[in-house]
Amino acid sequence: MKKFLTIAAVAFAAFATVSCDKENGTENGGEDNKPETKKVLLHLASELTEEAEFLYGRSFEYDENGKLSAVKEVGDWGSYNLTVTWNGNKVTFTEDNGDVAYEWTLNEKGYVVAKGDYTYEYDAEGHLTKIVEDWGEGPYVASIITWENGNMTSWSKEGEAEDGSGNARVKRQTYKTDLNKGGIFTAFTEKSSLKKWMFELGFFGVASKNLVASDKWDDRENGADFEYRTDADGYVVAEVKYWEGAIDDETYYIWK
């Protein structure tokens, strides 16, 4: 890779000592006898390996009750900080200059049900299933997300088929047998107006049970494939995306 921010380089150095069996997700003899471990996400960093390279690192801080209190991002372009405040069923992200970046309304399970012009619906298991947009001309369904055996199997861009038919454009996922212990979101609906970390901190429902193997549009011949490295407890520390056999981007995670 051509360039790393210091924090991403440190993260990668920590990950480099960890290896896993790509077939079963276990490390040197398996995890069957290991106690269950619960961790929170402290940091993620990502690098696109295309010509227009972009690298960022984002860290998360929590208060004494385990609630998110701050999000700090650093990139080649500078830094960006958000302070997180909780008030009943509202959570607000405020920039250093006092501007409100995000204000969300939560349901009784702590999942976001409203954000600006978007509303979000979930099934009984806590999976995000529908996104509705309303830009002032009445609500319309923007995305339908389907689930099977605890895994997201497809998400749609409703009415956006590239053939002009007005049908949905659909992206489908396949899965490995490896468990998704950290609840990462390798694949998520792009119609959500959300970022990867917002899903991975648990604000938008339950993640897929297993790790994503592939991700492909119905109207495309090729899609993306994914491989992972995990720590000793089975949490993903590196997610590698391949496009047509070449590395497209990599995401690194630090857990505690």
Task: Write out the residue ranges for each language-model feature.
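Buried hydrophobic residues that stabilize the cores of well-folded domains
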Residues: 22-256
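Positively charged n-region of N-terminal signal peptides that target proteins for export
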Residues: 1-4, 21-22
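C-terminal motif of bacterial Sec signal peptides marking the signal peptidase cleavage site
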Residues: 16-19
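Sec-dependent signal peptide hydrophobic core
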Residues: 5-12
